[in-house]
Amino acid sequence: MNSGKINQQFGLSHLTNSIFSTLNVADTTDYLALKQANMRECLILIDGMGQDAVNKYGDQFPIFEELKNVRTIYTNFPSTTATSLSTLGTGVLPGVHGMLGYTVRVPRSDNRLLNALKWDERVDPVMWQKVPTLFERAVLTGVSVTHVAAKRYEGSGFTQAALRGAKYVGANGIEEMVTAISSALVAQPSFVYTYLNTLDSAGHSDGVGSDKWLTALAQISEFITKVKESVPTGTRIWITSDHGMVNSTKQIILGQDNDLLENVLLIGGEPRARHIYINEGAQEETVAKWRQFLGNSAKVLSKSEAIADGLFGPVVSEDASERMGDLIAIANDDLIIIDPARVKEESSMVGHHGGVTDIDVEIPLLLT
C-alpha cells in the first residue's frame, strides 16, 4: 500500500471510536454506522493475526466460519504492536499520540532509545503519551471498562501510556481469562478489552503457518468459542488484530558490505520499519545514500518527507516530530533491515512486521 494513503483507510481508531459511540461516550464518532446503542461490548485483540493469515488458515477452525466478517481494516504506520494498540486505546493516529514504533529516541537524552513495550522507568508514561484514552473517557461517563490480559502487563509503562483508565484484571490461561471477561460484562453499560500475544510470538519464532503458529491459532479458536458461550446475552464481541506478519527470506545487515552506517548516530524502530538518527548536517547526504543503495527494496524518507507524506497521519505533534527518525526506511516485499548490534535476535526471527505491504497492514474485523 502507498505509505501516504495508509491513514486514509478504515483503521483501529475508527473501530474503537465506533464501539464507544454505541456506549454513548461523548465526542466519539460511529464510523461503522452501527446506529443502535449497545450496553455490552467486548473487543478481543489477537496480536499478529493478519487478514492474509485468516484467509489462508481460518477455514481449518470452525469458529472462523461462524464469525461475521465485517470488513478488512488497516493498521497505521508502523504496523507494530506499540503503535497499533496506542491508536486503539486513544482513538487518534500516531502523529497525535506519538507512539511511533517499537523503539524511538528519547528527545534531549544521551541518544537513548525507548523500547515502548519494555519501557524505561526514567520516562513518565502519562507525559510521554498525553492524549486521554477512550477508556478514561468512557469511565468518566459511567461505563464499566475492564482490561483483561496477562498479569505481567499490569501497571507496565506501556499499559499506562496507551491503555490507562480501565480496571486491569490479570489473567493467565484461557479459563481464567474467559471467567474474567464474562464477569466484567455483567455490568451495564460495560466494555471489556482483552489481548492475546501467543500467535504473534509463534509467528516471530517459527513463522506464519508453522506447526507452532497453527497450534496457537487453534488455542485462539478455542478461546473465542468459550468467550462466545460464556458472556451475558446481548454482548457484542469484536475480534481484530494489530498487524499482520511477513515470513522474511531477505535481509540486509547495516554496515555489512555497505556503508549505510556512515553518519548514523542511532538505529531505532524494527527490521521492517527503521527510525534512523543522523549526525547534524548529514541528513540529506545520508538519505540519498540509503535511497540509492536500497532502491526498490525499501522506501526511504527524510523526516520532513514523512511528515509531508502523512506517514503518521495528517497531524504531527511537536512531541512526535522530535521522536521521529531523521530517516525512515520502510522495507518492501519480505525484506528485513538488521541492526548490526542485534543480528542474532533479529535474523533468527522468521516472522516480521512494521511495513506497509498488504500482508503487514491488512487485519480482519470479525463479529460474533
Predicted regions and their residues:
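Feature captures the catalytic ectodomains and active-site-proximal regions of enzymes
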Residues: 1-368
